[in-house]
Amino acid sequence: MVASTGTRGALQATGDSTGRSSGSFILPLLFLSFILPVYFQLAGLQLSGYRMVLLIFFVPAMIRWFDGSGGYYAPDYLILGFAFWTVLAIVFHHGFSRWEYNGIAFVEATGPYFIARWLIRDERAFRAFVRWMFIAVLLMLPFSVNQFISNNSVLLDLFSKVGTTYPIIPLEPRLGFFRAQGPMPHPILYGVFCSVAFSLVWYVLGNDRSFTYKVSRSGGVVLATFVSLSAGAWLAIVVQLGLMTWKNVFAFLQKKWNMLLYMLGGLYLFLEIAADRPPAQLFAAYLTFKKSTAFNRINIFVYASDDVIRNPIFGLGFNPWTRPRWMLGSVDNFWLVIALRYGLPALIFLVAAIIVIYVILGRAQLPSRLENYRLGYLFSLTGFCIAAVTVHVWDATLCLLMFLLGAGLWMVNAKEESDQPQSEMKQSDRRRIRYTRFGPEDT
């Protein structure tokens, strides 16, 4: 489902200017709030900086979606379906006793998505989004490097003097260094958050720039991701690098992405037949720092999947999932958590939205300048989605995913800002110019 010609006209007439004027302060406000570690309690709600921003701009964003100025796309309805099903699942299991969780969960699932749909409707707004995400990563970087070396969380210590902050997670060193948590609740969340910027910085901010420029900027993102010492975050970077390499090596092939999908599908079938355990377990076993972690993830997948099969419609809510007593209750797989907590319909809604985004953007006929924008966007989204198989994401990192999903749909009907037909420009010039005996009035 794509926007009609009339909708595109309305977008050009009103949406762009509105998006630019609003985005001039909402985008930096949102991304700076993502990296603020302070929160407070109000009427049973845990409110942080980014949650306040989402609550303030949720209604305006929905109004801008309802007026049709940005068009209507299938992922819009699928994201709404995902959010409504999560609420329904919690009400099914716990009644309205979890009303505060349901309210915040609904806003975190839909707010970032529809704010992105409202604000990002052209190339300029998309570039501003990437720039502010990059700035957020850079602002966290020196504090994270310091924690990586000294194990001192300057950010959390500093903000703890003015309010309640996330607790510092005591984790054992890796590779002789300490895991940087930044202003996030966990090093994993910090690392995954930073990793999303890699391809976007390379292809969007680095578009038409020198190789040195791209490496210097994207290198900062890699460093920020590295100091989290999170295998899941590193995986996101590796996936993006792999896709970038594939694109360059097989640039001469028209169907290179189809070939990659066929190869990955064939590899999965081969492992399913030839390996002594499911591919998902192999994936978990080899993408970890320690064998004990791999063993734990395999057991999580086995026991939690069984619970999903036994409770396919509404999941388990916040009820305990079946596991041995010696296992912790955390589930290091975002997609599995969605199915386990809310049921398979919630997972299907969310995954379907992502697949549809790939399909409609892959088929979009873009001007040559915007091809790199699409690559950066899809590569970053792919890295996030694959990393989410090995980690669970929540809080600001989850909101970043939802924002990212809504941030790329403008490209479906995008035109370069300089693509106005010459004939229209000439006609416009002729209408503006008024001649007198002294020459054109404009002179």
Language-model regions, residue ranges each:
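Transmembrane alpha-helices of multi-pass inner-membrane enzymes
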Residues: 56, 258, 376-387, 392-443
